[in-house]
Structure formats: C-alpha cells, structure tokens
C-alpha cells in the first residue's frame, strides 16, 4: 500500500505542471490577439474599448515575466489606472482605467489612446523580444 501511495504522488508531481500555468500555446494565442487588437483598433473609440482586453492579457502574462518587466509595466499601468474599491477594500476585478467610463473630452481621448498605444507596444515587445 505504501508503494502505491508513493507511486500515485510521483505521478501527480509529473502531471501537475502540465495542467497549470501559462503554456506556450496560451502565450502564442495572446501574442496573436495583441497583434490583432493593435491592427484592428483604428479609431479612438475602438482603442479605448480595447484597453481592458490588453490589461486582461497582461494579467495572464504577468507570472511569466521577469521582475524588471513586471515593474516597468506595473508602473506604467498604475500611473494610468484607478483601484476599484468596494466598501473600502480592493475588488476582485482590481484596477480600471481612469478614463474608461467617463465622457471623454478630446484631451482625455488623446491620453486614453496614448495609453492604449503604449501598453500595446509594451505587450507586443514582450512577445517578440
């Protein structure tokens, strides 16, 4: 019985890495999605509407990044987002862009599209380099 338990634990150790984490296929799919988002976002509104999807891709990519890459993008994202609080506590969703649900003036649109372009180029750079 003891050897069967040991064998079972060993098998789980071998199989568990295959079932968890951010796989190469996930990374490739996100890379293609970032390229597609950047290519298809031609006007300001589509860029602004795509910001949250870029942030979601970054969240999935986050564990596989080096500490320097994380810090660089985190500083950039934190500078342009607000933390969402529910009863004074951060919500499960985390952070939202400062300009996502506001009536956008031309100046705010410029900031939002600049954020989209910079975040998109940073994410694309992670996938290519």
From Swiss-Prot:
Key words of the record: Immunity, Innate immunity, Secreted, Signal
GO biological process: cellular response to heat; innate immune response; response to bacterium; response to heat; response to UV
Localisation per UniProt entry: Secreted
Signal sequence annotation: 1-21
GO cellular component entries: extracellular space
InterPro entries given in the database record: Turandot
Keyword presence, Secreted: yes
Key word rRNA-binding present: no
UniProt similarity note: Belongs to the Turandot family.
Protein purpose: A humoral factor that may play a role in stress tolerance.
Protein's recorded name: Protein Turandot B1
Lineage: Eukaryota, Metazoa, Ecdysozoa, Arthropoda, Hexapoda
